[in-house]
């Protein structure tokens, strides 16, 4: 990302933090990243997630980052985070997206960043002390359980998992999958979204978020799921079942029926972070493509001078810059007017950024040839990230439908009527 872009998006404080993060990534993370992931694969057998662990010799990196004040930067709180706005943090998220390791080092990787912000905004004092503080300190990890295996999760009201009040307890039953981070040995708590029936409330106030300690009786990790053949150890994406799981009634976050409202509050900034990380990954992919294409020759010329590759590089540059500017606009609007006012822009970037990343990575893979699909570059991981993100957190089709509905409303129409709606 150029400093010119920073000039019209970030405050002086944001620019300063951006410079520090950039230097840390370039000097401390990038030189050891390839070895880190090689060690992860060597030390974490795919077939047995119960033995997964993070290579201990790299923990000093996290300690260095924390001591340098590069810790929990996504959190806008001055004491718990760095006091950065969404707009300030967005370019930093882009930097972390260039690396597969950086989000872990800075304690800002998903789903923890979203879960921490959720607990910071909506958690009670007791919940924050018990669950938020250890995650903020990097001592524990968390999981967000929303998607279910037996229903179309593009309609969140389809949820079959239930969270029913029984006296001073909540009883949870059901299954969730694609619960990211479930294989991490440091996971201590799951945030579970489930159906809480209440005939006195509308359909969008009958779902709740519940804090479930990972070792509660009745919680069972069924399996880890491969993404394009990779388990993503030691993080993992798993399927988990809840069989008559009982937790205290004060484990509701924000109270029963608040699930959808909290989800929107969690997912708004989170989508900015996801999309800027996508843009960072796209930048890295383009950089790799240019270097590979100019250093390799065929028929007496650099690869980039053959077969329309100049145009492919130009298209990538244009798409990345367009995606970045749209995402920064969404961030600025969210800061200035709130998440609700930026719903169109937030849905738009959720469609655009992963798609741009997928297209740029595909181009970079083609330039690299066989090397592009093996473990010698980040490209396969970036491709998996892009393709999965077009489904995670709402598929493209859901976001496009949202954009269209908001556009009709802006012009005075409803989805079902061809006549303007009277205001």
Give residue ranges: language-model regions:
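Cytochrome P450 core scaffold surrounding the K-helix E-X-X-R motif
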Residues: 81-84, 221, 251-256
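Flexible, small-/acidic-enriched active-site or ligand-binding loops
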Residues: 158, 215-246
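N-terminal glycine-rich flavin-associated loop
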Residues: 106-126, 155
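A short, Trp-centered hydrophobic/proline-enriched beta-strand micro-motif
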Residues: 138-147, 192-193
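Short, surface-exposed charged micro-motifs
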Residues: 160-162
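Short Gly/Pro-enriched turn/cap motifs at secondary-structure boundaries
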Residues: 150-154, 181-185, 200-201, 228-236
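A short core secondary-structure module
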Residues: 168-169, 173-222
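Alpha-helical interface subdomain recognition
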Residues: 1-100, 109, 122-127, 134-139, ...
